[in-house]
Amino acid sequence: MRYLRGEEAVTVRPEYAGTPIYVLAGFRSAMVAAKMGLGVILGGPVATQEAAARVYREHALADAPPIISSLNIAVADTPAVARDLLLPEAYAKVLAQSTGEFGALRPAGELDMDALTGQQRRRIEEALAHDVWGTVREVGEELRGVGKRLGVSEFVVTGDMPDVAGRARSEELLASLQAEN
C-alpha cells in the first residue's frame, strides 16, 4: 500500500534482465537470427521449420532462447468444423495468387468453391495440409508430435478466422490442451 500511496519504491524480483528479441523466421532468417544471438519463431510448413530449427541450433549461441513454432491451428468439436475455420484464409491466399488481391475473409459457408479451378482447389488442400486442425485429441497428438520433431515446447497460434464464435471455441479448446500439460 505504501507503494500505491507513492511513499515507497518496489524492488522487482527477479531483477529485469531485458526482453528477448525473437525473429519470425523461415529457413534463411533462422541462420541469421542464430548468428546474431536472437531468438527465433519459426513459420511455414513443419518440414521447413524442421530444417530451420536444425540450422538455428547448429549456429546459435549457447545461451540462445528456446525455439518457438508458429502454426495455423484450429480446434473444434469435429475435424470438419476445425478445417472450415482455416479454410477462409487458405481460400483468400490462393485467390490472391491468381488475382493479386487479398480480399476480406469470408466464413467457409460463403465461399464459392465451385468457381475455383482444379489448380486452386489443389493449392487450398496443400495449404490446409500444412495447418494443424481437428478435435482436441487430434490437435493435441499432432502438436506433441510436431513439438518432438522440432524440439520445441511453445507454439504461437496463427490463422485468421472470420467465424468469431468458432475462433472463440477453438481458443477455448486450445486452452484445455494447455491445462492438460
Regions found by a protein language model. Name each.
Residues 19-24, 38-43, 65-71, 155-157:
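Hydrophobic faces of well-ordered beta-strands that scaffold small-molecule active sites
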Residues 1-11, 53-150:
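An alpha-helical appendage that flanks or caps ligand/catalytic pockets
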Residues 44, 158-166:
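Glycine-rich, proline-tolerant flexible connector loops at the mouths of alpha/beta enzymes
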Residues 149-160:
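Bilobed periplasmic-binding protein-like "clamshell/Venus-flytrap" ligand-binding domains
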Residues 46, 73-75, 161:
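Active-site-proximal loop/turn and secondary-structure-junction residues that shape catalytic pockets
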Residues 44-49, 97-98:
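Short, acidic/turn-prone active-site loops that include or flank metal/cofactor-
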Residues 52-59, 163-181:
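C-terminal helical cap(s) of enzyme catalytic domains, especially alpha/beta-barrels
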Residues 1-38, 48-50:
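Internal, glycine-rich beta/alpha segment that forms the wall or movable "lid"
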